[in-house]
Amino acid sequence: MDHKDYIHPAEFSADDYGEIDDPTGFESELLSSEVADQHFAVIDPQNSLRARCSVWWRDTPCLHGERVGTIGHYAATDSTAGRAAIRQAMHCLRAHGCATALGPMNGNTWRSYRFIVDRGTAPPFFLEPTNPDSWPVDFTACGFDPLSWYVSEINFDIANRQPELGSLRQKMDRLGVQIAPINVDDSADDLDGIYDVVCASFRDSFLYTPLDRESFRGIYEPLLQKIDPRLMLVARHAGRVVGFVFAPPDYLQQARSIDTIVIKTFAILPDKCYTGLGRVLIVDMLHNALDMGYTTAISALMHTENRSQKISSDCAGPMRRYALFAKSLTS
């Protein structure tokens, strides 16, 4: 392929996608719904997209007290074009005062971020980001290094491999914690409580950014319409939500029989009296899944330093590894 003068990333808009051939299948409405600050594309002489990425320098995470910019919506059919787009994104973020670039990240960790770096043999699962092996290489070729690591783990035998509870069930019973499926007749009230738990539980997490209540509902309400309420359990105590676990079926198995749930999110209020509640929620979720005919559970996209990964490792094995990359823009 001839990489001549056309490899110059240009600013691009959602409307421009209607004028080109896009083999990456980008959903251009994401530029507005995910509030990208700028978008770049490399178009070849045949009017075909070779690479694209967006940048965010507003409402992004902090890292070591410094301002961070992020590079997301990345795709490339050609590494030379992809790396040109990444370098243009870095130049843009530097010009807007960012000390560090993170990627891939669509603005913040509420949206898609991370690359698969160790694929394993298992097929993709529901809500998992995916990428060709070449895309992380494009970032490292531009000077990025892994900043944080994440894993997904799989338990092929949820009937016999579950977290140990010891006396935790009795502890929660004595406290008066009640666990039940989300209230489908008043899911808005439960979602408000879940939002409060998420904000309290994750506020000290790595690269956390606040999310308003309405945007949180926008993420979860469409998912709730698809799943059986037994796969979203809510823990309540003294009239408020104190924890939850969300584990939709692996809908990417629809071409064959679905036998797997994806434990996507669980969170507990950071109060010592609720220590161990996460394990109880997971066990109750696995019991529900078994009753519904599921046999396998994926613990999805866990930071390797998080307690959720420690709970998962008791009964699940390695499946996939991911990384988020970073590069200083000040040196």
Show which residues each predicted segment covers.
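A conserved beta-strand-loop-helix scaffold within acyl/acetyltransferase catalytic domains
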Residues: 6-45, 51-63, 181-268
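Short hydrophobic/aromatic beta-strand or adjacent loop that forms the aromatic wall/cage
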Residues: 37, 148-152, 319-325
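Conserved hydrophobic/aromatic beta-strand scaffold that supports enzyme active sites
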Residues: 73, 152, 232-234, 244, ...
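Generic recognition of stable, solvent-exposed alpha-helical segments in well-folded globular domains
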Residues: 81-84, 134, 189, 193, ...
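Acyltransferase donor/substrate-recognition loop-hinge adjacent to the catalytic core
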Residues: 129-206
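Short beta-strand-to-coil "C-cap" segments at the C-terminal boundary of structured domains/repeats
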Residues: 155-158, 326-331
